[in-house]
Amino acid sequence: MKTKAAVLFETHKPFEIVELEL
Protein backbone atom coordinates (compact mmCIF):
# COMPACT_ATOMS: atom_id res chain seq x y z
CA MET A 1 0.00 0.00 0.00
CA LYS A 2 1.39 3.37 -1.05
CA THR A 3 1.61 6.24 1.37
CA LYS A 4 -0.82 9.13 1.05
CA ALA A 5 2.03 11.43 0.05
CA ALA A 6 3.11 9.05 -2.73
CA VAL A 7 -0.43 8.84 -4.08
CA LEU A 8 -0.84 12.62 -4.04
CA PHE A 9 2.55 13.04 -5.72
CA GLU A 10 1.60 10.67 -8.55
CA THR A 11 -1.85 12.26 -8.89
CA HIS A 12 -0.52 15.82 -9.17
CA LYS A 13 2.68 14.98 -11.02
CA PRO A 14 1.32 16.06 -14.45
CA PHE A 15 0.13 19.37 -13.01
CA GLU A 16 3.46 20.03 -11.31
CA ILE A 17 5.32 19.29 -14.54
CA VAL A 18 3.14 21.81 -16.38
CA GLU A 19 3.85 24.45 -13.74
CA LEU A 20 7.59 23.80 -13.97
CA GLU A 21 7.50 24.15 -17.75
CA LEU A 22 5.67 27.48 -17.61
UniProtKB/Swiss-Prot annotation:
Location in or out of the cell: Cytoplasm
Top class in the EC scheme: oxidoreductase
Organism: Rhodococcus erythropolis (Arthrobacter picolinophilus)
A single MF term (Gene Ontology): oxidoreductase activity
Reactions listed under catalytic activity: N,N-dimethyl-4-nitrosoaniline + a primary alcohol = 4-(hydroxylamino)-N,N-dimethylaniline + an aldehyde; ethanol + A = acetaldehyde + AH2
Keywords: Cytoplasm, NAD, Oxidoreductase
pH-related activity note: Optimum pH is 7.0.
Protein name stated in the entry: NDMA-dependent alcohol dehydrogenase
